[in-house]
Amino acid sequence: MRTITHIVLHCTAGGAQQKTSDIISYWKNKLGWNKYGYHWLISEDGSAEHLTPDSEVCNGVKGYNANAIHICYKGGWDGTDTRTDEQKKKMLELVTNYKTRFPQAKIVGHRDLSPDLNH
């Protein structure tokens, strides 16, 4: 298993009802990525898709991916926290699980690690 130093929280910066297939298509076709952007993607009903195995690196935050777990919720279009209660519950469940497994890991938001503190 990789050494996990960060648990990074994200929003898709899109509508809460985005289709996962559209998000994946954006990564592949627009950004040219051959890996997914997150380990977990949480829909507005609180269901979560495990997109990338924990043992694998994904494209969450440049420079931090080798040692991070990335958890994202669908939403956050206007830069505000648009999580539903169900998304908050699932995110807390996932973060709690990972923090138990990797107690040394820092919990941060994507913007805390990006150079301009905005992307």
What are these regions (language model features)?
Residues 1-39, 51:
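Cell wall/extracellular polymer interaction/catalysis modules
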Residues 1-12, 44-48, 53-54, 64-67, ...:
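Basic/polar, cationic surfaces and motifs that engage anionic cell-wall
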Residues 22-24, 63-66:
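Surface-exposed beta-strand edges and their flanking turn/coil or helix-capping segments
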Residues 40, 71:
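Divalent metal-coordination and catalytic microenvironments
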Residues 57-61:
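Flexible, surface-exposed loop/gating regions in the mature catalytic domains
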